[in-house]
From Swiss-Prot:
GO cellular component: cytoplasm
Record's keyword annotation contains Transport: no
GO MF annotation list: ATP binding; ATP-dependent protein folding chaperone; isomerase activity; unfolded protein binding
NCBIfam families per the UniProt record, alphabetical: GroEL, PRK00013.1, PRK12849.1, PRK12850.1, PRK12851.1
Keywords on record: ATP-binding, Chaperone, Cytoplasm, Isomerase, Nucleotide-binding
Record-listed E.C. numbers: 5.6.1.7
Record-linked HAMAP family: CH60
Pfam families, sorted: Cpn60_TCP1 (PF00118)
Family: Belongs to the chaperonin (HSP60) family.
Reaction catalysis annotation: ATP + H2O + a folded polypeptide = ADP + phosphate + an unfolded polypeptide
Record: residues binding ATP: 29-32, 86-90, 413, 479-481, 495
Protein name: Chaperonin GroEL 1
Amino acid sequence: MAKRIIYNENARRALEKGIDILAESVAVTLGPKGRNVVLEKKFGAPQIINDGVTIAKEIELEDHIENTGVALIRQAASKTNDAAGDGTTTATVLAHAMVKAGLRNVAAGANAITLKKGIDKASDFLVSKIKEQAKPIADSNAIAQVGTISAGNDEEVGKMIADAMDKVGKEGVISLEEGKSMETELEVTEGMRFDKGYISPYFATDTERMEAVLDEPYILLTDKKIGLVQDLVPVLEQIARTGKPLMIIAEDIEKEALATLVVNRLRGVLNVAAVKAPGFGDRRKAMLEDMAVLTNGQLITEDAGLKLENAKLEMLGTARRVTINKDTTTIVAEGNEAAVGARCEQIKKQMDETDSTYDKEKLQERLAKLAGGVAVVKVGAATETEMKDKKLRLEDAINATKAAVEEGIVPGGGTTLAHLAPSLEEWANGNLSGEELIGANIVAAALTAPLMRIAENAGANGAVVAENVKSRAISEGYNAATGDYVDMLAAGIVDPAKVTRSGLQNAASIAGMVLTTECIVADLPEKKDAAPAGGGMGGGDFDY
């Protein structure tokens, strides 16, 4: 395909145009008075949402060059979402502000590479400052505050997430399900999550989220490699007669057997999914035994004289629900509390007996997975559109609370970044010079962008609010919900330090990359062939 090549200022301006479009679409959702965005869907009802990264993923522009700008800034949102699970809109607004100011300087003749060095140094300085300011989470009240802010000021959701964390512990897992009623409910069940995803993406049952969800499946556990499909045939025939799904956890499944499973899954003969067993060596075997206890099944291992081809239905485990994505598997089982309790006691004894710190750590991990359980939040709403929006908000809230537990909290509402701007300017003036100093000042100027946008979305003057906040004490900021200046920590308006840090780092990284762009190579739009001429009427000198 023919390519279009654009250089220098033209290239950067085209990128900027795409970045402007995406940033504006996402920024309208920022803050307690941020608005929603409607996404048109080719199939099904339109989606009304308030989630930055979801909006960013939907935007595709007709112009290939502008679309490259959209893709670059989308990366800042996606990376922040992957690292912290929230703060995607803030990352987009920050990246946009840095790019706009940086491009002005590059157009005026500044060296883009030196500017980028200044931006990177400023970013490192700010990350260390955010770590200094972060306060550890003291109690479930602080967790509830983080959840409330991330869920769009929904106190009920914040409290529910705090309760869930109390019940399953910091090591436990909180997952989301679509509920059957209007109310959002919390349900805590025994369960286990491990870091292995499906072997083949063809096992996914939900293609939009790329997840395999199996309800009430049988679970086949084995510590051997499954190479031949003949080994599986007897058990597959027994499962097919029951009409229930099957989940296979094995050391590995080789090509022939895997191909057979995939074909059966795609043809609808058997709803099956397969994952590799977690861990290595003896530890893998121990984890498989944990799963056998949890699911009330048997580990099919030759050490116990059991062979795969002789496996019976009663040897398989069962679960209420299994959710598998590309990286993780969550097994929610119930009704086997006594056996699980006995297994936990056994692991605790092993922990007491071992002197190795590493072994203790791994045993603690197994204990948390076995005893921690899974809290399921059942999302309730009046309509499907509202449910999808609520689910995305809850997902953000759960991720934000986990991030807060990891790295602590800082004053929210864009306050922390705005207060860091004067510190950065002071540090940069003392430590940097020339164009590196200009790069750092670009970051300093961009730090107030999220606060200004939050204020503007609430109908206030962003520049005035930003100056007022900078002149106040470090924990004081602007409460956009009420229009007052308050102590943010006391008012419960807090952000996880990890979310603020990730957003800033990713924004600085993308801004640096855009500024140092000198040439874009993109596809030329394909010319559509003109419609062929119609046939003549015949009999005359001309075709009409």
